[in-house]
Design a protein with these regions (language model features):
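Short, well-ordered beta-strand elements within core beta-sheets of diverse protein domains
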Residues: 35-41, 56-62, 147-148, 258-261, ...
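Glycine-rich loop-to-alpha-helix module at the N-terminal edge of alpha/beta enzyme cores
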Residues: 33-122, 133
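Rossmann-like NAD(P) dinucleotide-binding subdomain of oxidoreductase/dehydrogenase enzymes
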Residues: 124-268, 322, 394
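Residue-level signal for inorganic ion chemistry
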Residues: 32, 68, 90, 112, ...
Length: 479
């Protein structure tokens, strides 16, 4: 029996062998086999990485932005060269289907190239002064050392979402991947090492969030911590960062509503909502978690929805290419989904499809449709993060908007209608960072991914996401 590979960290331009005794097993969620081990890193490891990033930052910032962009393009080229290898790692450690893993890797390379294009485009300002002979200059400066704490659902892309704008604008970064999906991050670090990126500009630390994450947020040398994860984890990061008044950028949970109007294209709505719910086995914070259907089409829509969900195939993504879903990430995730469905049933919901975990190896949960659901049920308010879809009927658009907004979360929302006036009313009424009209919930790199309320602070992507990594210096120049 082969011994699982033991991965090192990447600090100050070197792969660092772990000298500690404690290791964390990385498990294939499709088979429950241990596929690798990573160090159970401690705060001291994070401090070393932060110190390396601090040493490297002034010289990195001094480079012209276009030169920093050229390094990003070398990274994206390396990703494309290793695309098949990286996709396989994502499938193995994350349970993601092959097609989605391939999309994630390709999108990551494209995203890095997109951010590199901003090298000549982010600007300061010259402002008219009230004083004779004075110029007011606004410069955009790097923050300094930044840190990125990643989730496991889109682990490879999230490296780029934090690293690319940080490095492009003259910051350095320390990345901590999820302990459930670290192998793809090791592959990323190997690319960084192979292209010869200056030491300390990019660092990778491995371990648990509750130990390393606290140092990445609480170290006084850190200028900004960017985290993607749960609300509870975000609260801890925010509290720790507050001790040094450190800037935070948080993308947290979601409970995305999808509103289906009487005049909707039902074929489009059903396909988009099902695709949005089963993608990555429902483990996506911005995809539809609850559906509101106007009463005039409720029966017809629910019948079509049930047929579409029944047709969804799932299994081991390493063995099958004809599936739309793999397993959930781990045993704890499977148990949480089971508990949320059980509670919904206790509160009066009816399981129309699915509703029971699959027996045997792997953390599989089938597409599940819940009917006879009421707005006050917990399943309409708590994030499920699994392939479970509760459906509620409504009379008027105003009622649907009111129920959609009745949430602690405010990340994404969607509406299906062929009436422009209805769509515009929904856009104005829905209190979410993103609203999708007649399409699945998946953002664009040139947009801005940002949640309201408990879904987060700050945002990512596009011009506005780039500016999260900049601070403004004002100069009053009297001649």
């Amino acid at each position: 029996m082969s011994v699982p590979v033991q991965h090192p960290m990447y600090i100050d331009g070197q792969f660092v062998t772990w000298r500690g005794d404690a290791w964390i097993d990385v498990v294939n969620p499709a088979t429950e086999a241990v596929i690798s081990r990573i160090p159970d890193g401690q705060a001291e490891d994070a401090r070393k990485a932060i110190d390396a990033a601090e040493r490297a930052q002034p010289e990195w910032e001094a480079l012209p932005a276009i030169e920093r962009a050229s390094w990003l393009r070398k990274i994206s080229a390396g990703i494309r060269e290793r695309a098949s290898e990286i996709s396989a790692l994502i499938v193995e450690e994350g349970g993601k289907i092959q097609q989605l893993a391939e999309v994630e890797v390709a999108f990551t390379a494209d995203y890095i190239d997109y951010m590199a294009e901003w090298a000549r485009r982010y600007e300061g300002e010259i402002i008219q002064s009230d004083r004779p002979g004075e110029n007011i200059l606004l410069f955009k400066r790097a923050l300094g050392v930044t840190t990125g704490i990643l989730p496991w659902n889109f682990p490879f892309f999230l490296i780029a979402r934090k690293m690319a704008p940080a490095l492009l604008t003259g910051n350095t970064i320390v990345i901590k991947p999820s302990e459930f999906t670290p192998n793809n991050a090791i592959a990323f670090a190997k690319i960084v090492d192979e292209i010869g990126l200056p030491r300390g500009v990019f660092n990778l630390v491995l371990g648990r969030g509750e130990t390393i994450g606290q140092e990445l947020a609480g170290n006084p040398k850190v200028a900004m911590v960017s985290m993607t994860g749960s609300v509870s984890a975000g609260e801890k990061i925010m509290a720790t960062a507050a001790k040094n008044i450190t800037k935070v950028c948080l993308e947290l949970g979601g409970k995305a509503p999808a509103i289906v109007m009487d005049d909707a294209d039902l074929e489009l709505a059903v396909k988009a909502i099902v695709d949005s719910r089963v993608i990555n086995s429902g483990q996506v914070c911005n995809c539809a978690e609850r559906v509101y259907v106007q009463k005039g089409i409720y029966d017809q829509f629910v019948n079509r929805l049930g047929e579409a969900m029944q047709a969804v195939q799932f299994g081991n993504p390493a063995e099958r290419n004809d599936i739309a879903m793999g397993p959930l990430i781990n045993a704890a995730a499977l148990e949480r989904v089971e508990q949320k469905v059980a509670r919904a049933v206790e509160e009066g919901a009816r399981v129309a499809l699915g509703g029971k975990a699959v027996e045997g190896k792997g953390y599989y949960y089938p597409p599940t449709l819940l009917l006879d659901v009421r707005q006050e049920m917990s399943i309409m308010h708590e994030e499920t993060f699994g392939p479970v879809l509760p459906v509620v009927a409504f009379d008027t658009l105003e009622e649907a908007i009111s129920m959609a907004n009745d949430s602690d979360y405010g990340l994404t929302s969607s509406i299906y209608t062929q009436n422009l006036n209805v769509a515009m009313k929904a856009i104005k009424g829905l209190k979410f960072g993103e609203t999708y009209i007649n399409r699945e919930n998946f953002e664009a790199m040139q947009g801005f991914h940002a949640g309201w309320r408990k879904s987060g602070i700050g945002g990512a992507d596009g011009k506005h996401g780039l500016h999260e990594y900049l601070q403004t210096q004002v100069v009053y120049l009297q001649s």
